[in-house]
């Protein structure tokens, strides 16, 4: 409250006009992001992660019914584990990278990426009804996706981009992610 010496919350801040030099530096930083191979590698990685994420979300129940013989109720239950574990992975991604790996996100991103591959192999390559194996696959997949959404989908790009162009880095990765998600629908629908 203002009576305690705090500023009013309803007063709009004055927008400072950027000088020509600041504008040129800002534009240069954004172009620099587009020229960074690491940003494009992150964007491609995020696109592939979104392909696998939306493939499981879109086709997981059908796959479990058609290929493994689950009932609709059991298949839906197994697939519903994935987003719940994704929330948990997202919640703990910062703790994992900051506390366990000292702020380095590349090592946990690799670990959780490999965990996703392992989970997909369990899910797709173990034939027949093995309820607990499929549940384990969705737990691992969901946790991995939750962490990777945070790392690949944003934090790693912001970490390596110039501070005044972090929005451009997030934009490149975000666009690639949703292109991957859209392509998954087209590719798997054929």
Q: Which residues does each predicted region cover?
A:
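Paired intracellular helix-loop junctions of major facilitator superfamily
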Residues: 102, 156-166
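A late C-terminal transmembrane helix in Major Facilitator Superfamily
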Residues: 163-190
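Juxtamembrane intracellular "pre-TM" segments in multi-pass secondary transporters
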Residues: 3-42, 67
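Hydrophobic core of transmembrane alpha-helices in multi-pass small-molecule transporters
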Residues: 131-155
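Extracytoplasmic gate region of multi-pass secondary transporters
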Residues: 35-93, 149, 153-154, 181-188
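Cytoplasmic membrane-interface "Motif A"-like loop-to-helix N-cap segments
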Residues: 98-113
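C-terminal ends and interior cores of transmembrane alpha-helices
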Residues: 114-128
């Amino acid at each position: 409250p203002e009576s305690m010496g705090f500023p009013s919350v309803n007063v709009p801040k004055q927008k400072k006009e950027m000088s020509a030099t600041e504008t040129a530096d800002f534009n240069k930083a954004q172009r620099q992001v587009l020229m960074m191979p690491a940003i494009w590698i992150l964007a491609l990685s995020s696109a592939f992660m979104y392909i696998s994420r939306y493939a499981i979300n879109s086709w997981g129940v059908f796959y479990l019914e058609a290929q493994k013989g689950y009932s609709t109720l059991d298949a839906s239950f197994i697939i519903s584990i994935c987003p719940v574990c994704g929330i948990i992975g997202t919640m703990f991604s910062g703790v994992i990278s900051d506390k366990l790996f000292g702020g380095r996100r590349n090592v946990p991103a690799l670990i959780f990426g490999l965990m996703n591959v392992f989970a997909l192999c369990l899910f797709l390559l173990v034939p027949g009804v093995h309820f607990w194996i499929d549940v384990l696959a969705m737990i691992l997949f969901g946790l991995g996706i939750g962490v990777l959404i945070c790392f690949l989908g944003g934090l790693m790009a912001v970490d390596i981009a110039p501070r005044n162009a972090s929005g451009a880095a997030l934009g490149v990765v975000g666009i690639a992610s949703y292109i991957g998600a859209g392509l998954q629908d087209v590719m798997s629908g054929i």
